[in-house]
């Protein structure tokens, strides 16, 4: 099915009022495009390291929205023009130019799946999408099935590969594992498959926690969804999944377990790893490892300094493409 895309040009000053007017006309799914600089608070909510280049703010905003039924278009144009005329008494609405284009209806949530194929992380670890068949398999292969849904973590990204390889290198069988920012659960699953006795995974996104549970089930690993008010039992052979913010919530950290883990992994972003490094040691036993990844190379030194500042010993720094992973150790005391 084809949709009609309408683009309305206005000013950044008037954009909120114009959007309210469009909503009053029954228009939903509004997208605003402008060059207004991103605030520090917005940067935090975006969870990205590299910000888009917006160019100089020209005071112009474009509001995009979509129509399924073209028959509604003539009357809608009239209503929009009338609404703009009313707003002109209060604010500069700009040109009010309305342009029309056509776009195909696509399954944007699932289209990426056609590009996600089975692949090898190394000689023995194979990542396979749940919807794909594995044509070749060696007896020694450890095959992990993943459907990340909308959560991060197919295993294909350099940051995830770095974590997987470091888990394989440093984690001992029988370890207690904590995965902070678990995403799809891929690192938790691989950790358990490589011999972790117990595993706890946490993410600030409830959807990620749900995706992790589903992927644990697919890989025939026992996993339970825990409330943020629950306390971890760290039952042998079981994965416990929490949602919440361990950086800000001291009570949650206590419930997950202090001084309890041999191995902590965090494949997130540099701007989150830095404050995490101040509290992650609370989870760790003396001599435990902290593997961080998701660090863009331009921020690697900043993360390294934060980890050292919080009393860790850096064992190894590995890179892949533009990304860095840091293996750190809590001193034995």
Curated annotation (Swiss-Prot):
GO terms for cellular component: cytoplasm. It is an enzyme of class 2 (transferase). Its main location: cytoplasm. It is found in: Cytoplasm. InterPro entries: Ribosomal_L11_MeTrfase_PrmA, Ribosomal_PrmA_MeTrfase, SAM-dependent_MTases_sf. GO terms for molecular function: protein-lysine N-methyltransferase activity. It holds the Pfam family PrmA. Belongs to the methyltransferase superfamily. PrmA family. Methylates ribosomal protein L11. This is Ribosomal protein L11 methyltransferase. It comes from Lachnoclostridium phytofermentans (strain ATCC 700394 / DSM 18823 / ISDg) (Clostridium phytofermentans). The lineage of its organism: Bacteria, Bacillati, Bacillota, Clostridia, Lachnospirales.
